[in-house]
Amino acid sequence: MAMDKKSAPTSLYRDRRSFAKIPDVMDVPNLIAIQTESFDWFKNEGLAQAFADVCPIENNTGDMCVEFGKHEFGEPKYTVDECKEKDVTYQAPLFVEIRFINRETGEIKEQEVFMGDFPLMTPRGTFIINGTERVVVSQLVRSPGVYFASERDKTSDKTIYNAKVIPSRGAWLEFETDKRDLLSVRIDRKRKQPATLLVRALGLAETREEIIELLGSSEMVLRTLDRDPATTKEESLIELYKRFRPGEPPTIDSARTLLDGLFFNPQRYDLAKVGRYKMDKKLGFTPEENDSSTLTNEDIIRTMRYIIGLHNGDEGFVTDDIDHFGNRRIRTVGELIQNQFRIGLSRMERVVRERMSMQEPDEITPQSLVNIRPIVAAIKEFF
């Protein structure tokens, strides 16, 4: 009997199973890859793009210029741990090949110029600034492109529409209707003015009949033409310049240069690939028809026709939901630093131009033209 008690049957023991333990269905992704990959893009491609945007920097007469070549980073002075201990920034020197070209004599001088110490990203996706570890947070911003929206006017209870052409870099172009059934344009968030003023200034159409043929004969177009103070291309350019740069003496050449620089200069205006894609899709272009990174005259015409179609209630014209994630994009650390670096470069560009005009051509060297303080200051502002 004792032996029977000791050898209890195995069926009496419970079979325990844990449902808390489940096998991994997928590997955990690298959650900081968006940070490290974006900064690697900036070091390899973003910096080169920023330098290309300002090349070449010419003097007033155009007989001398400065060009930027390859860039490279040196070795950091301290390791990440040493920077934390010494309360210093984890950074490396940036060197750029700069060429000075005298077009009159054909002389070319090339030097590798130190452009300042640049903060580096650690393997953890962070920056060490004065010994403190910091993270740059990505931004959720409006995607470049053209967007149409509507709202109710509080006084008249009319539906008014607006169109915003948002670039990745450059001036905004906005069209809007109002309770008086007028179509206005706002350039770079300045005072609004009749939209037909821009049509004439760009040379898209000049006479009343040409504008009606271009935009249609709706009541809105006719009312806007009646409010337009200009009747020729030259008058429109002067009017635009006076409203955009009040206090400065307007000339036709300066007005034309201003308008071209705002929307048609790749160095100052960039829709980016996503902006061009979204604009083409909204306005009915095919990629073969329009692949420009800047605005085109046809972009402006079709945008105006679209907002007129919305106001008239025509079929097939719909507004956009700007809060929809399809109309948003993530601006990562590499792009944020690139934008700040561009600000420093544009400040330095002015200094280089001034020095080219002041120094004797024989004495000019790339090192003597470049002042790195604006770039260093811009990067410090960011971090």
Q: Model segments located where?
A:
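N-terminal non-catalytic structural scaffold regions of very large proteins
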Residues: 1-383
